[in-house]
Amino acid sequence: MSGLSHLESEGCRNLLGLLDNDEIMALCDTVTNRLVQPVDRQDAIHAILVYSQNVEELLRRKKVHREVIFKYLAKQGVVVPPTAEKHNLIQYAKDYWAKQSPKLKDTAEPVTKTEDIQLFKQQAKEDKEAEKVDFRRLGEEFCHWFFELLNSQNPFLGPPQDDWGPQHFWHDAKLRFYYNTSEQNTTDYQGAEIVSLRLLSLVKEEFLFLSPNLDSQGLKCASSPHGLVMVGVAGTVHRGNSCLGIFEQIFGLIRSPFVENTWKIKFINLRIIGGSSLAPESVLKPSVTFEPSDLEAFYNVITLCNSPEVRPNVRQIIDSGTGDQVLHSGDEALLNKREMNLLTPLKH
């Protein structure tokens, strides 16, 4: 459910009404990670309000322009300095809604209104639909959102599409980054801030462009009964007009318990292979070199991490990369096996 109060929701609803249709639909895609497909403008506004964690997060969005907040406040009779910056306007709006609360208590209204009933019905429908998640579609929508957002941070492509940052990751997120270009190296990163900054540097400082292959061979997904979703995707790596090689990436996603139908990144394994290490035909349409059952192995291993007798070997398998073998929780032989081979080139 939304983290906005009733007054904040109504205020933001009126404020969003000042945006045009294209801006509303784009904002809905951003807030919901493109996992909600609104049927019309009102449905999109409803989704924006429901899936926003708080009013400040919503109003800070780049698509909610400073001029829109200023115009809304003027319509409400709130006088603010014309030169006020956006963060000040947000505070004016929050203060205005807070002052409306005592007035609301003095007004006798039915406890349950028609729109409340509709909201409850909508939420019940969403909860029921959440039980039947199409993980293939979720993976595809996630990859569209992730790579469009990341690539848009490349300074050669114009202004960024939206805010990139640690808010898209769990606070203890992990990244294992392996590359085989002019040299080979594997580096681990932990924490939402450092993980997001390392990924950002690929496009903002190294000027890379990651182009995912989202057909049946380039994208594979799997899920666990506990809500962990794993997405494997392959694609090509570019800089300007040059194709430098290919990449293979595994995402571990966990649904947020606070915002319905919103997922955050728990871990990423990223492998980039330079073109000199590849057969020419493998660059044309890279494919994921593991099966959904291999993705499930990541979950099986994670659930065993707290077991002292298997922790050392389990940690090796988690930290390795491709999942070339299926791991089952009872497979002692595989648990005792040496670290799986992350450093072998992708299968061609």
From Swiss-Prot:
Keyword Protease attached: no
Alphabetical keyword list: Apoptosis
Taxonomic superkingdom: Eukaryota
Keyword Cytoplasm in record: no
InterPro entries per record: NTF2-like_dom_sf, UPF_C3orf38
Pfam families, sorted: DUF4518
GO biological process: apoptotic process; positive regulation of apoptotic process
GO cellular component, one term: nucleus
Reported function: May be involved in apoptosis regulation.
Protein known as: Uncharacterized protein C3orf38 homolog
Taxonomic lineage: Eukaryota, Metazoa, Chordata, Craniata, Vertebrata
